[in-house]
Amino acid sequence: MLKLIKIFNSNSKGYWYIPENSAPGMIEIDEKTGEVKIAIESTYDKELGYPYFANKAKGIVKQMWDKQELPDEKFFAWG
C-alpha cells in the first residue's frame, strides 16, 4: 500500500509518500526540468535496506507530472 499527499506551504514541489502506514518520505519535482527525485527516504524503506516504495512513488509522481495531473492525494494498493 502506498499513499501520496501533495506538499503544501513549502518551497518544495512534490509529494509525501507513505508506505504501509509508516513514517513518510518525500518525492520532489524540479518544475523547470521535470526531474523527479527522492528527497527523503521513508523509515520503512530504510528498514528494508533499499528504496522500494521510494522508487515506486518516484515513478508514479513522474507519470502524474508528465500528464499534468497532480491530485492532492492518491492511494495505491496491490497484492
What are these regions, as identified by a protein language model?
Residues 5-30:
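N-terminal acidic leader/helix
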Residues 36-79:
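Acidic, low-complexity intrinsically disordered segments
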